[in-house]
A protein has these predicted regions:
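Long, low-complexity intrinsically disordered regions
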Residues: 69-71
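Basic/aromatic-rich interaction segments and small domains that mediate binding to polyanionic partners
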Residues: 2-67
Length: 71
């Protein structure tokens, strides 16, 4: 199921992340589009400022501004 609770919230990587679209260095910024569970794992789809959109694991990112989270 797609969870859009945090859609539009800014995030950043907390360490180097290698993806199929390209590498994301530590402190790369992006915007969360949605979260989804796939094969028992939670994934977060992020539109990165580097020009591509790829899923990452929640432990690879942190939310930049909690004031934007819609509950």
């Amino acid at each position: 199921m797609i969870d859009r609770t945090r859609a539009g919230v800014r995030c950043r990587t907390i360490r180097f992340v290698r993806t199929v679209e390209g590498d994301l260095p530590k402190d790369a910024y992006g915007t969360i589009r949605y979260e989804i569970e796939n094969l028992g794992r939670l994934l977060v789809l992020v539109e990165w400022d580097r020009g591509f959109t790829v899923p990452v694991f929640p432990h690879e990112i942190e939310v930049v501004n909690l004031a934007n989270v819609r509950l």
